[in-house]
């Protein structure tokens, strides 16, 4: 049986919020068949920004990254589905929005490396999804629910013959 309940952390960054793209980005993930299990409209403070981007601490762009991510509200989310972490990365597109393929979120809406609209956990960094979810959400902020459409997304959940 396929594991349908992998969870991943996703965030609409301040540029996406300011440009009114929360709805479009959520729609992309919903229509792919992923299920939202948590969502929080919030501001990231310095401390959380440092923790979230700890892997980039030594990079020359770190200070700019922290000041960007704390510059306005973000929409933090947890999404669930089969292979969810990698699936979200594919929907996001390449880090530099100018290189991101048309059809991806960054490719369709972005034009910049820093202002690239969306964060998603790195599927090549084992456990990054669980770490980031725990950093942003308490367990009781995540909702277990059955999305009826899942049986029409995943064939192995279907009850037809
Ligand atoms: P991603 O957001 O695709 O996971 P990442 O984790 O390598 O990319 O980097 C985190 C963010 O930092 C990225 O969304 C944009 C910014 N960034 C990455 N590389 C950069 C660079 N060389 N110069 C400036 N900003 C950069
Ligand atoms: Mg990353």
Curated annotation (Swiss-Prot):
Location(s) in or outside the cell: Cytoplasm
Named cofactor requirement(s): Mg(2+)
The gene coding this protein: ndk
Gene Ontology cellular component terms for the protein in this record: cytoplasm
Protein's UniProt name: Nucleoside diphosphate kinase
Keyword Ribosomal protein: no
Enzyme class, first EC level, given as a word: transferase
Source superkingdom: Archaea
